[in-house]
């Protein structure tokens, strides 16, 4: 059975984690419930996540908003109508242009069925997405977490999560990607909720 988070399940999972983990309990008590940060499943969201690879959330959102304004409706066909210069103008790098076009072509030729992913287990969703060039662990994890609202996904290599953990624990060194995935094992089956709490801490602590 595929389980998806909603606001009610998010709160329940936060309370469960707070009982098990003092650090997450402190975040929850200090800053409250994290946002669900849900996104609509499908092509447009995957393009948005591709734009977020290795750049700030704000920078990616600016590029995505320009893209949507330019094409009005972001579909595979509409994206493929844009040339290199047009994509560069809205904020695509050469690499990301190739990734987005590859995704658009894969959707149009039936190489991937994004709707069908919604009913697959996490590991199968990741395997299907990672067949596409430019979509690796982080991109597929974020899609699972935000678009499909899966509760037990920890984005591999997410810098903000590593920084949040370093600050939360007052560590001299930031954990590596592999080290952090091992740390996250303690939060099963709610690793995606732990990630939301840590992002919430990362963003909220910067405002204090």
Residue ranges of predicted features:
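A positional/architectural concept
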Residues: 12, 19-65, 69-72
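C-terminal accessory module of base-excision DNA glycosylases/AP lyases that mediates lesion recognition
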Residues: 1-34, 122-123, 137-208
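Structural motif
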Residues: 36-44, 91-95, 184-192
């Amino acid at each position: 059975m595929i389980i998806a988070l909603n606001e009610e399940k998010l709160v329940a999972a936060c309370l469960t984690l707070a009982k098990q983990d003092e650090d997450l309990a402190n975040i929850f008590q200090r800053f409250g419930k994290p946002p669900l940060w849900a996104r609509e499943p499908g092509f447009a969201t995957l393009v948005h996540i591709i734009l977020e690879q290795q750049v700030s959330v704000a920078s990616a959102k600016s590029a995505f908003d320009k893209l949507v304004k330019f094409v009005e409706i972001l579909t595979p066909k509409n994206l493929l109508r844009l040339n290199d210069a047009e994509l560069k103008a809205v904020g695509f790098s050469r690499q990301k242009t190739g990734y987005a076009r590859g995704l658009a072509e894969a959707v149009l030729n039936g190489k991937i069925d994004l709707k069908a992913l919604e009913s697959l287990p996490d590991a199968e969703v990741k395997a299907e997405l990672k067949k596409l060039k430019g979509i690796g662990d982080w991109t597929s994890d974020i899609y699972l977490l935000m678009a499909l609202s899966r509760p037990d996904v920890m984005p591999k290599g997410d810098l903000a999560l590593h920084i949040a953990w370093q600050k939360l624990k007052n560590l001299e060194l930031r954990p590596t990607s592999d080290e952090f995935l091992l740390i996250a094992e303690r939060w099963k089956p709610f690793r995606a909720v732990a990630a939301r709490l840590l992002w919430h801490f990362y963003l909220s602590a910067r405002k204090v």
